[in-house]
Amino acid sequence: MHVTNTLTEYANITKALHWLSVIILFIQIPLGFYLVDLDFGDQRITIEDIHVTLGLTVFYIIIIRLINNILNPTPKLDPSIFKGQRFLAKMNHVLLYVAILSITISGILKKLFNGEILTILFREIQINENFDLADQFYEIHILSNYTLIGLIVLHITAVIIHKLFFGDNLLKRIL
């Protein structure tokens, strides 16, 4: 059981945070699309509350993951992996974090500028309504979601390509 990343494998905490993020995002993304088509009413309020709670949870997990990445550098990629692929992998990871943070922060700001009260880190926060800004943050929220979906597809495709065509054990590092 690794408590810190090794040269070849991620630590158990890193793996747990990764897979927890994956599970929540794979619930959260379809939930968000479902929410868009719901009429206003009790069901929408319930689903929206779940969506906000999961969104804030992802936000906290990503912050913890970023701190973990700073304190606990990632394992090195095998030198046999082409330098360009290593660069693309790094960029994909960075952009995944940027997209997730963009989604969560824009979602938070959209709710706040709509005049809603959010509880963040055990504090209730409310700001003055600004529906124009709320609409802009909603657009960022949507664009960031589509960006995230594209990045996830690239991420999974790269894992499959590495497993099937390159025969390396890249996936083992995070399992």
Model-found features: residue ranges?
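Membrane-embedded alpha-helical bundles that constitute the cytochrome b-like, heme-associated redox core
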Residues: 1-175
